[in-house]
């Protein structure tokens, strides 16, 4: 961390991937500079690289996102699976840290995830003027919700009509 800090690379425009080997001094410096961290939980397990001290980052005020790294590491690019893993992996017996809440993990996947990108002002929340950053889930078939071919969300206003989703491409 000290090495990249010497070059002035830390700051709000920098997002560090994984963050599993950060020490107390590193965490303090990330907080001071506004540097973000992207927690790639399933990737860390596949690589056997460690578990990020997520709530230490949270306590320090560091913006943390949920990431999936890449398909070769995550298998399915399934963000819901990744969110479940982040929620559960920090609930290991014997860990002294507080556990993340569902609301915290949801924030990491939405608004905090957006904050770690250059699109922070246009994604990450359902607000007027922002891109539709959402997913529709058919709870009867939740195996792979990202493969839902029935309701693609591509810059289209969505409405309900006769118990079905209707949208108009713009």
Predicted regions and their residues:
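Short beta-alpha connecting loops at secondary-structure transitions
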Residues: 65-71, 90-101, 150-156
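Active-site beta-loop-alpha junctions enriched in small/polar residues
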Residues: 19-21, 42-44, 69-71
